[in-house]
Amino acid sequence: MKTLVVKCFLLLALVCSCRAADSIWQLCNTNSNISASSQVSKNIDSLLATLVSKTPSKGFKTTTSSSYNNKEKVYGLAQCRGDISNTDCSTCIQDAAKKIREVCQNQSDSRILYDFCFLRYSQENFIGKLDTGAGLIYFNVANVTEIDPKKFDNELGALFDKIRSEAVLPKNKGLGKGKTKLTPFVTLNGLVQCTRDLSELDCAQCFATAVGSFMTTCHNKKGCRVLYSSCYVRYEFYPFYFPLDPAKTGPSVGRISSVHLSP
């Protein structure tokens, strides 16, 4: 059973081309407290240095860092969104590594998500394991008025069936994206991304769990993002993935609600 905690706020600058420095979600497990001078903390610093240097070339990296005592071993993963450049990936991972040590400096189990990248480390080996426990949902509180709600549900479902099927193919490395015309003037844009350590089956399962929120928390809303440690799904009424159409991009200013998911 998941617990939902809802918060509403005014989002003044949710733009289609989010800067790497705009963090979306961070989680510091308070059951994994460590001291700043501990060997585990030093191993985390070493692990982050590896992730910062090695992730941008392929957009993904898993690694470990340990000393003589395996009890102090730390596992790490970093991944950039599959449609961004190596330069943007590098910037995002650097920012993530710096920020996570600031906000989770006393925890050995931490994760941080940006629009362009995701970074996680833990003393528990999470690599290759599906995780849809803790998560976060952002949605636009405005309802869809441009088309009939049932038609919107059908179009949204068809689009995400398509891009989910594309994402689980090995050649696409967990990324699926696409768009569909709702009216001559309104286009629905969608993107899915799972972490590349997952099997095709686990990736598909994560997407199914995340997309399920479209019919509940986000039902008939003009935009929604569902974030888990293992995957990320999003739709908007404006372009937000690359390559962008400069003529159609711009800010979406309005009231956004967030829902925190916990196991």
Curated annotation (Swiss-Prot):
InterPro entries recorded: CRR_secretory_protein (IPR050581), GNK2 (IPR002902), GNK2_sf (IPR038408)
One Gene Ontology CC term in the entry: extracellular region
UniProt entry keywords in alphabetical sequence: Repeat, Secreted, Signal
Cleavable signal peptide: 1-20
Domain Gnk2-homologous: 22-126, 132-240
CDD domains to which the protein is assigned, alphabetical: Gnk2-like
S-adenosyl-L-methionine listed as a keyword: no
Places the protein is found: Secreted
Domain of life, source organism: Eukaryota
Keyword set includes Secreted: yes
Main location: secreted
UniProt similarity note: Belongs to the cysteine-rich repeat secretory protein family.
Protein name: Cysteine-rich repeat secretory protein 55
Species of origin: Arabidopsis thaliana
Source lineage: Eukaryota, Viridiplantae, Streptophyta, Embryophyta, Tracheophyta
Gene that this sequence comes from: CRRSP55
